[in-house]
Amino acid sequence: MNTLITIVLPAGRSAIELSLFVLLPIMVVMLSMMRLLEAWGVLDRLVALLTPILRPFGLTGLATFAAIQVSFVSFAAPAATLAMMEQRGTSDRHLAAAFAMVLAMAQANAAFPLGALGLSVLPVLGVSLVGGLLAASVAYHLAGRGLSSEEQVLDETLKHPVAENAKGVVDVINRAGAEAFRIAISAIPMLVVSLTVVTALRQAGAIQALTNALPFIDPDLVLPAVTKYLAGGTAMLGIVDEQARTGHLSAAQLNAWAGILIHPLDFPGVAVLMAAGPRTARVWRPAVLGALAGIALRAGVHLVLT
């Protein structure tokens, strides 16, 4: 019992520090900017501009908005947009393309906090967009070509608050702050549990055994990768933060592995996005296949860049 307590207490302290002093302020600023641009109609104009360009990749106007959400809010934010696409009659084939794109792109709730640890965020977002487009193309034109392309008449407009005066701006910022607080607080349990489990596995020698069994993989990559694919990007963030603080992970390594570690294609991410609706859940296979292609491209580009 004493051993468990000595593991849990430092894990809890690290989780609180990461959530409240790194994740929360970054998400408050990013969400406030995102919601203000949305309320001022900037995002509406951007979506209208990009939609004709992205159509050949199998993406609709709402899918474009989902790409903005995953890049600047969090991996879970596009779930609401996918649900809206499903309800408004988007075809299964277009749903698969949008789902694949989201799974392959860098998630804001991991990318921006990792910027404080040396991650070059702008290149990550640029490469992420290219990977997302490839993922959507593979899902739409190859993996999902057998899916239905039949669509209803789509309403591509976005329903959101409008900030027409100073009070409206303050209201938007307050709502964004509350949303950021919910994201940060909801991350604490997963961070505590993941840090506790990983510390216990490390002390039991399981991580070292896995590292020895995979000699062709950088030993410093094994722990973040296992954590990321089993427990999600937020849990991975906690592990990477700990490794960076103890000097076991450099900024160069973090940038080289960005394509492998920063995306929602993990068990929690797929589960959350599949919950958007029954049709979205049915197209997970072509979406995952497309996402794998996009992530492979991102991983290769980041390795070349570093």
What are these regions, as identified by a protein language model?
Residues 48-63, 150-169, 217-218:
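Juxtamembrane inter-helical linkers in multi-pass membrane proteins
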Residues 38-47, 55-82:
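Membrane helical hairpin/interfacial module
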Residues 23-32, 127-136, 151-159, 187-196:
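Hydrophobic mid-bilayer segments of alpha-helices in multi-pass membrane transport proteins
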Residues 78-141, 238-306:
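C-terminal transmembrane helix pair
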Residues 30, 34-54, 169-243:
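Transmembrane helical segments that form the transport core of multi-pass membrane transport proteins
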Residues 1-45, 303:
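N-terminal signal-anchor module of multipass membrane proteins
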Residues 1-6, 10, 144-178:
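Intrinsically disordered, low-complexity non-transmembrane regions of multi-pass membrane transporters
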Residues 63-71, 220-230, 255:
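A loop-to-helix transmembrane entry motif
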